[in-house]
C-alpha cells in the first residue's frame, strides 16, 4: 500500500515559479531588483488581504431557488435535438437485456466466489470483501465465457469486473510467457491505462502469468522488448497498441480475450479508425470480448457489433429511475461575473487547503497559467494536462492519488475512469461542454457504495441555460450564493503581479486565448455564446489589465474533442 502524504509544495514553489523568479532576476540590476521587491510585496499583500476576510466561504452559503434565463430562438431547435441525444438511452434492440431490476447481488461476498487460489489470495490482500452490483452481475457470465456489453455509472467497480475473469482465463488455460499475449485491455487515456495496470499487477501477484502496459509517451523500445519476451495480459491505449501490432514482432495469435473500457470516450477523442484497424488485425476465433461504456451511443453500438460475438449479454446497472450521479454526492453551482471568477476560486481554495480538491479547466494553457499563478502566491497545487510529457503526467497522477490533501488543477484528461481516492471537492471552474462531461467530472468524487463528496460549478449569468440540460439529464443541483464581502478583494494586487512579471504575463495571455478558443468550440451554442462574454472581465480573471487580441476559429475545423487530452 502506498504511504499517504500531503501534496508537495508547502515549503517551496513549483518549478515554474523558480523559472519565473530566475528569468526576472536576469534583467538589468535596477529593473530586476525592483521587480523582485514588487513581486514579494504583491504576494505579501495577497496574503494580508486574504487574512482580513473573516469567515470566508464558511457556513454562510445560502441555498435560494435557482435562477432562469431566456435563450436565443435561432439555435433552439438544434440544441433541443442535442439535448435529446445526450439524455436519451440509445441501446440497440439486438442486444438482449438481462433483467437488471434484481437487487439480489447486493450481498455477494468475494469469499464465496469460485476463483482460483492465487486470485482469492490477492483479493483478500487488497482488502476487497463485498462485490459491487456491476461485479456481481458481470463476473459470472464472463467466467462462463459470454461476451458482455456493460453499462455502469462511473465509480461502480467495473475494473475488477473485467480483470478478475480475464486473469482467471489466463490461469485456467495455463498460459505461459512464451505463449504471448492472451488478453488485451484497451483504454482511452494513459492515466487510466496506468491505473488498470496497477490493479492488474496486484491481482496477478500470486500468479505465474505476466502483465504489461503500452501507452503513448512511454519508451517504445522498452515496450517492444517486453512484448517480445512475452506479456500475457496487456493494457494499452489505442494508438500505441496499433503501432506495436503493425511494427513490433510479438506473439498475439493466442489472443483469448479483448476488453474495451470506456468505449464511448475512446470514440469521442477520435480513435474510431484506430479501433477498427485493431479489431481487424486481432484474431477473433474463440475470442471472448467485453465492452464497457458509461453511455450507449450509435458509435458504441457499431463498435460492439464488430468486436463482440453475436448475441452478447447486455448488463446495465443504472436503473432508469435513478439520478445520473452518485447518491453520496452533494452538487451545487455559483453564479458570478467573469471578473470575479478567480477571486472566488482563490477564496474557496484558500479556505479548503486541508481538503483534497480537483479543479477542472477547459484548456491546457489555462491549467498551466492558473497552476503557475497559485504556486507563485504560495497556494500549492499540482497540474495535469495533455501537453505534459508522459513521465510528468504519471508522477503527478500518483502523487495526488497518494496525498491526503491537496489541489489538482487539470483538463478533462482526469475526468474519465480514474480512481483517485478520497476526493472531497470537484470544482468545475470552466463549464463542461454537455451533461455527460459534467457527470464524468463529478464522478471523480463520491466513488464506491459508501462514497461521499461535493461539487461546485462556476457559471456566468449568460450560462444559466445549461441548468436545463442538467435537469433533463437527472442531475440534482442547488445554487450556492457567496456574499461579496466574503470574497477576497485581491484584484489590484493580482493585476500588479501579472503586469510586472514577464513570464506570468505571457502565460496569462496564452491562458486567456486558450479559454476563448475552448469557449468558442462549445457544442451548446445557445448556452455558451462567445459574443455574450465581456472580454474585459474575462481578461481580468487572468490578471490582465489589457484585453489581448485573439483569432477565434468559430465554425472552422478546430474542435474541442482532440486525441491529446
UniProtKB/Swiss-Prot annotation:
InterPro entries linked: DDX18/Has1_DEADc, DEAD/DEAH_box_helicase_dom, Helicase_ATP-bd, Helicase_C-like, P-loop_NTPase, RNA-helicase_DEAD-box_CS, RNA_helicase_DEAD_Q_motif, SPB4-like_CTE
Swiss-Prot/TrEMBL domain comment: The Q motif is unique to and characteristic of the DEAD box family of RNA helicases and controls ATP binding and hydrolysis.
Gene: HAS1
UniProt-recorded name of the protein: ATP-dependent RNA helicase HAS1
Gene source species: Candida albicans (strain SC5314 / ATCC MYA-2876) (Yeast)
Basic and acidic residues bias spans: 64-85
Positions of the UniProt region annotated as Disordered: 1-106
Keywords: ATP-binding, Coiled coil, Helicase, Hydrolase, Nucleotide-binding, Nucleus, Ribosome biogenesis, RNA-binding, rRNA processing
Entry EC no(s): 3.6.4.13
Main location: nucleus
Cellular component, GO annotation: nuclear envelope; nucleolus; preribosome, large subunit precursor; small-subunit processome
Amino acid at each position: 500500500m502506498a504511504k499517504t502524504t500531503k501534496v508537495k509544495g508547502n515549503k517551496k514553489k513549483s518549478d515554474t515559479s523558480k523559472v519565473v523568479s530566475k528569468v526576472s532576476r536576469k534583467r538589468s540590476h535596477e529593473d530586476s531588483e525592483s521587480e523582485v521587491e514588487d513581486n514579494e510585496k504583491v504576494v505579501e499583500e495577497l496574503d494580508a488581504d486574504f487574512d482580513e476576510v473573516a469567515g470566508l466561504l464558511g457556513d454562510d452559503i445560502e441555498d435560494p431557488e435557482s435562477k432562469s434565463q431566456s435563450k436565443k430562438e435561432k439555435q433552439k431547435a438544434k440544441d433541443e435535438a442535442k439535448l435529446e441525444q445526450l439524455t436519451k438511452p440509445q441501446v440497440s434492440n439486438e442486444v438482449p437485456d438481462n433483467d437488471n431490476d434484481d437487487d439480489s447481488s447486493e450481498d455477494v461476498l468475494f469469499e464465496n466466489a469460485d476463483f482460483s487460489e492465487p486470485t482469492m489470495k490477492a483479493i483478500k490482500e487488497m482488502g476487497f470483501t463485498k462485490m459491487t452490483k456491476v461485479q456481481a452481475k458481470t463476473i459470472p457470465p464472463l467466467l462462463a465465457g459470454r461476451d458482455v456489453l456493460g453499462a455502469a455509472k462511473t465509480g461502480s467497480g467495473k475494473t475488477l469486473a473485467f480483470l478478475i475473469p480475464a486473469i482467471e482465463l489466463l490461469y485456467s488455460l495455463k498460459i505461459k510467457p512464451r505463449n504471448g499475449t492472451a488478453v488485451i485491455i484497451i483504454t482511452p487515456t494513459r492515466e487510466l491505462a496506468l491505473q488498470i495496470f496497477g490493479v492488474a499487477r496486484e491481482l496477478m501477484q500470486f500468479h505465474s502469468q505476466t502483465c504489461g502496459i503500452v501507452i503513448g509517451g512511454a519508451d517504445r523500445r522498452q515496450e517492444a522488448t517486453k512484448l517480445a519476451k512475452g506479456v500475457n495480459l496487456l493494457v494499452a491505449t489505442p494508438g500505441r497498441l496499433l503501432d506495436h501490432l503493425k511494427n513490433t514482432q510479438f506473439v498475439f495469435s493466442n489472443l483469448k480475450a479483448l476488453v474495451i473500457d470506456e468505449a464511448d470516450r475512446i470514440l469521442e477523442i477520435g480513435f474510431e479508425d484506430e479501433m477498427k484497424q485493431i479489431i481487424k488485425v486481432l484474431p477473433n476465433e474463440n475470442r471472448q470480448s467485453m465492452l464497457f461504456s458509461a453511455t450507449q451511443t450509435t458509435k458504441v453500438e457499431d463498435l460492439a457489433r464488430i468486436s463482440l460475438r453475436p448475441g452478447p449479454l447486455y448488463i446495465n446497472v443504472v436503473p432508469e429511475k435513478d439520478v445520473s450521479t452518485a447518491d453520496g454526492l452533494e452538487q451545487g453551482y455559483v453564479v458570478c461575473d467573469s471578473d470575479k471568477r478567480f477571486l472566488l476560486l482563490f477564496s474557496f481554495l484558500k479556505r479548503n487547503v486541508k481538503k483534497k480538491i480537483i479543479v477542472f479547466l477547459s484548456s491546457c494553457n489555462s491549467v498551466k497559467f492558473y497552476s503557475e499563478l497559485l504556486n507563485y502566491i504560495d497556494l500549492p497545487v499540482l497540474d495535469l494536462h495533455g501537453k505534459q510529457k508522459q513521465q510528468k503526467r504519471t508522477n503527478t497522477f500518483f502523487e495526488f492519488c497518494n496525498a491526503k490533501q491537496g489541489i489538482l488543477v487539470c483538463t478533462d484528461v482526469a475526468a474519465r475512469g480514474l480512481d483517485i481516492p478520497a476526493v472531497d471537492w470537484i470544482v468545475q471552474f470552466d463549464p463542461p461542454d454537455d451533461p455527460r462531461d459534467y457527470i464524468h467530472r463529478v464522478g471523480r468524487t463520491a466513488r464506491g457504495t459508501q462514497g461521499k463528496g461535493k461539487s461546485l460549478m462556476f457559471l456566468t449569468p449568460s450560462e444559466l441555460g445549461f441548468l436545463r440540460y442538467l435537469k433533463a439529464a437527472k442531475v440534482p443541483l442547488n445554487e450556492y450564493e457567496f456574499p461579496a464581502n466574503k470574497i477576497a478583494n485581491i484584484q489590484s494586487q493580482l493585476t500588479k503581479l501579472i503586469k510586472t512579471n514577464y513570464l506570468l504575463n505571457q502565460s496569462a495571455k496564452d491562458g486567456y486565448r486558450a479559454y476563448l478558443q475552448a469557449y468558442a468550440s462549445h457544442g451548446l451554442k445557445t448556452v455558451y455564446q462567445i459574443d455574450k462574454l465581456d472580454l474585459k472581465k474575462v481578461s481580468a480573471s487572468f490578471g490582465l489589465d489589457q484585453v489581448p487580441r485573439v483569432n477565434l476559429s468559430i465554425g472552422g475545423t478546430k474542435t474541442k474533442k482532440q486525441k491529446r487530452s
